[in-house]
């Protein structure tokens, strides 16, 4: 399974621990969609921070994705829900290491 497919699967299942395991210890996840929902952008550094961040977001039902579709080997489109705001988004795996772990992933409004 490609890293983008694993990312979408973890997001759909709200698997914060599995999501964090997809990243290198110093992996970076940047989400720019939140500005469309009148929230601050997310810049999350490190797999432990990714785990804690999404544990909170999934646990309090403040983040989810719907209707994911793969665009290519590095990108997926979906509807991102930020606490009631739905935004069309595109996630891109920008960089992986030699083991296929994500070093950098960005999510932007489509």
Locations of regions flagged by a protein language model:
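A beta-strand edge to alpha-helix "cap/lid" segment located at domain peripheries
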Residues: 52-110
């Amino acid at each position: 399974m490609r890293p983008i497919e694993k990312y979408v699967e973890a997001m759909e299942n709200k698997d914060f621990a599995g999501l964090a395991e997809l990243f290198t210890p110093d992996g970076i996840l940047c989400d720019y969609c939140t500005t469309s929902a009148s929230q601050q952008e997310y810049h999350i550094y490190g797999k432990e921070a990714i785990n804690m961040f999404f544990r909170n977001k999934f646990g309090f039902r403040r983040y989810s994705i719907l209707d994911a579709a793969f665009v290519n080997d590095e990108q997926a489109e979906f509807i991102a829900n930020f606490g009631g705001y739905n935004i069309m988004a595109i996630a891109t795996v920008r960089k992986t290491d030699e083991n296929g772990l994500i070093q950098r992933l960005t999510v932007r409004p489509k």
